[in-house]
Amino acid sequence: CFSKRSLEYWDRLGVGDRMVDKGVVWSVGRIFHGESQLYQFNLLPEDGHKRPAFINLQQYYAEAYLVDRISDLPEVDLRWRNKVTALEQRNDSVALTIETPEGAYRLHAQYVVACDGARSSLRPIIRTSRAFMTQATLT
């Protein structure tokens, strides 16, 4: 299930139409208690909104469409089977240690964003490093 907000981001990436065309649009929401329907509500797009509230789409389609789109973007470097195993805060950057089946390497970045899913290997590393706790994250 993907929300309207996800679809809006995908529109910015140029894959929103493809996702909606393949997915199942939710038009009605229902709340049940046992066999009894307690409430029903409209999930159709709101006036002035392009996208519905939700669509159902298998994750493998979403991933495939995003990978297809990334192949058209030369500024994106997609790396498979790479795992961040360590982070080191520097004055103006972060040094990452990355493990691959071919061996480890280091990468320097200005920013690090943990977008590696529910079983993130990156977020626990960030959480345990006080160096990554900035005033912005503490307030």
Task: Set out the residue ranges of the language-model regions.
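Active-site-adjacent segment of FAD-dependent monooxygenases/related oxidoreductases
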Residues: C1-S71, E88
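Core beta-strand elements of the Rossmann-like FAD/NAD(P) dinucleotide-binding domain
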Residues: E102-Y111, C115
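Flavin (primarily FAD) binding-site architecture
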Residues: A114-S129
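A conserved short coil-to-beta-strand element within the FAD-binding core of flavoproteins
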Residues: W80-A95
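A conserved hydrophobic secondary-structure block that centers on an alpha-helix together
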Residues: D72, S93, G103-Y105
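A generic structural motif
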Residues: F32, T97-P101
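General small-molecule cofactor/ligand-binding pocket signal
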Residues: V20, D77-R79
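Pore- or pathway-lining transmembrane helices of multi-pass membrane proteins that form conduits
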Residues: A136-T139
